[in-house]
UniProtKB/Swiss-Prot annotation:
PROSITE patterns linked: RRM
Matching Gene3D superfamilies: 3.30.70.330
Protein name, per record: CUGBP Elav-like family member 2
Record-linked SMART domains: RRM
Lineage of producing organism: Eukaryota, Metazoa, Chordata, Craniata, Vertebrata
Keyword terms: Cytoplasm, mRNA processing, Nucleus, Repeat, Repressor, RNA-binding
GO cellular component: cytoplasm; nucleus; ribonucleoprotein complex
Gene: celf2
The organism of origin for this protein: Xenopus tropicalis
RRM domain mapped to chain residues: 35-118, 127-207, 428-506
Amino acid sequence: MMVDSRLLVSDRINGTTNKMNGALDHSDQPDPDAIKMFVGQIPRSWSEKELKDLFEPYGAVYQINVLRDRSQNPPQSKGCCFVTFYTRKAALEAQNALHNIKTLPGMHHPIQMKPADSEKSNAVEDRKLFIGMVSKKCNENDIRVMFSPFGQIEECRILRGPDGLSRGCAFVTFSTRAMAQNAIKAMHQSQTMEGCSSPIVVKFADTQKDKEQRRLQQQLAQQMQQLNTATWGNLTGLGALTPQYLALLQQATSSSNLGAFSGIQQMAGMNALQLQNLATLAAAAAAAQTSATTTNANPLSTTTSALGALTSPVAASTANSSAGAAMNSLTSLGTLQGLAGATVGLNNINALAGTVNIAQMLSGMAALNGGLGATGLTNGTAGTMDALTQAYSGIQQYAAAALPTLYSQSLLQQQSAAGSQKEGPEGANLFIYHLPQEFGDQDILQMFMPFGNVISAKVFIDKQTNLSKCFGFVSYDNPVSAQAAIQAMNGFQIGMKRLKVQLKRSKNDSKPY
């Protein structure tokens, strides 16, 4: 109530409080240091006019923006708004008088008023400059003299080593961000100081968010490097496996019914990871042999032959007799190119439907994804089938690790997927939870590209705050790649977060018919 009485006094003295806060002197634009304020706990029935009447006692209002729910017709207020005063002083006075103090009619809680996220209350990090390529002969006073023409300097510090000597860089904090921006425009690369090899560098100092984002990106890069290294190590270490295991695996993949999987129980002593490696070896051996024996052939035919080898008993027999030779030949560039060709073929699997019995292959994989419950299979056999599912998607991971040049070309082809919301076929669309807030479309694209051809990658952004909602969608052009991504990335830890990756629910799931 003291605030209200003070305002009444100022009205009598000055005619209006607006005059006290510079409203009569303002220009068409707010002051450079003006603050955009977020205001919550306002009645949903209030319009901009009523809000203006609430705020104008503290100073002239430049802009009021009521947040509305556009999904309703007509759009309804969300009970909050943004307000920008012409002067910084007016905004702070309004905050001091209203925040957690005044409760508006019909509301149960007092007004919440604070600088918008974009303003950060004129935080130091928004006004702090990094000065690089500074002469080591300069001290703090020299830096102050150099930058004082641009405004009031709150702090000036030269970075020094343990010996007390200058490291050739400094930090300068101005009173306002506008002053700092003017200093950057005028001083950046404007001169080369004594003892320096390059012109002076003047830019905003890294914020804590910048540092955290850089740390997360480095951590993700290291983890993906380890993943690729481990994956390629698994492939190259399979040469010692016997042809008998390969024959059994080929027989399993060449069958269109689940009865053929009974023979896999002979491998009961092997864990799921070893079985997955077996599947990958079979695919790699078939692709390698096809590459070695086919010359001047159409790439589509080559890939068709490689895929046919995965389902053909004849190819299985050939792979059994020459598995060791195929693995040794993987070290040659020609063979690796054949492996990459097989990968491209998998990405265009629909184009081969008329040549290879793809339906037979995919029907078995579809059974792996949920139709096995009624067959009475043991956990070990189910794990084996799960490993076989990855055989067709695993090749791409190994090709990426072994062929960084070819893989980078694939990367360029998929760049357009970042930010788009194009959906793939049924079972090829993923929902990713618990993404770091710093992650954007490009980050999620790079993270999920090793598992297949990504046709879209999108991180969802809050339209009001312009910040990530920490979830997104990734779509592949085939369900096999999506399954491989789920198995590799579900539970993958980035910083303090552990990703949750699952299939996007079908639109038909909610329909009762």
